[in-house]
């Protein structure tokens, strides 16, 4: 348990509620179960000369999913009626162009949100000499919250 070294309103270190923390731990999550269920095992969904699309599966209890795209030129995406949270994790910069003509530039390490209402958009690598690697997170289609 960690309190991120934040200070309370009185300027002193905040006390930890150990019992509350213990109630939020899953002690059955250990050993082989961790390897099988909690550690992400990425796999390639699509690979061709234009791009590689990888799925980075999340735990079944997580409400979000993650894909990783690697490409040199451009890639077209559909929102499928959900927002996308994207981050450029490799490369220089991209230009995002929505189907209605809106354009926005993003640089390496920047995070941006594409609203579901955008419907479709194109991600254009501004420096095709360097590949772009982009991570996209979105809410799973069927979510069951506990």
Please give the residue ranges for each predicted region.
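C-terminal amphipathic alpha-helical segment
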Residues: 1-76, 80
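Glycine- and charge-enriched low-complexity intrinsically disordered segments
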Residues: 16-20, 141-146
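Glycine- and acidic-residue-biased ligand/ion/polar-headgroup-sensing regions
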Residues: 68-100, 108-109
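Short, well-ordered beta-strand micro-motif
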Residues: 68-70, 113, 136
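Residue-level marker of beta-strand positions
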Residues: 93, 111-113, 133
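Short, surface-exposed beta-strand-loop junctions and turns on beta-sheet-rich folds
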Residues: 102-104, 129-130
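Conserved metal-binding segment of the jelly-roll/cupin
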Residues: 106-120
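Ligand-binding loop in jelly-roll beta-barrel domains
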Residues: 116-143
